Amino acid sequence: MLTTIRSIQKNDNSPLAKIVRQVMEEFGVNLPNTVYTDPTTDHLFELFQKDRAVYNVAEVDGKIVGGGGIYPTDGLPDGVCELVKMWLLPEARGLGLGRTMIEKCLQQAKELGFNKVYLESMPELKQALRIYEKFGFEYLNAQMGNSGHTGCQKWMIKVL
């Protein structure tokens, strides 16, 4: 089994949008005001052309199984980026890909000059929240920035 992580390409838009929505449905978090209904979910390649934004695609044996990135979300304080759209299909879990993706994103955030990484999640995503805690993310009492994803009820931040 060959696992790879690479930069997003334009032809990844459709498979990645399907993965995001499939995983959200799996956990019952396919709700309004989340990435599930966000129109940018269908155009990730274009979204991540923004300066200081990076999106990584995870593959197993050449098949796209997920992705995740960092993004300079509007309204975040200077030096803070957001860990965004981190999703893996069920068959990709337990392979260490999630951990590798987060490590890569944190390293990319540092290289791009960020000193903190913020994220938004949901209580239903218990396994993801535990992984973020292991990486040193700490819970916040309120949302930061203007992601527009008011359907998320868990907010975390990590100092790099």
Give the ranges of each region predicted by the language model.
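C-terminal "cap" of GNAT-fold acetyltransferases
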Residues: 2, 22, 115-118, 122-160
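Acetyl-CoA-dependent GNAT
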Residues: 3, 7-91, 102-104, 108, ...
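Residue-level signal for short amphipathic helical patches enriched in basic/charged
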Residues: 11, 112, 120
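Residues that form or flank phosphate/diphosphate-binding pockets in enzymes
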Residues: 78, 96, 127
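Active-site acidic-Proline motif in GNAT/NAT acetyltransferases
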Residues: 89-91, 95, 123-124
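Short coil/turn segments at alpha/beta junctions that flank glycine-rich nucleotide-binding fingerprints
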Residues: 95, 111-115
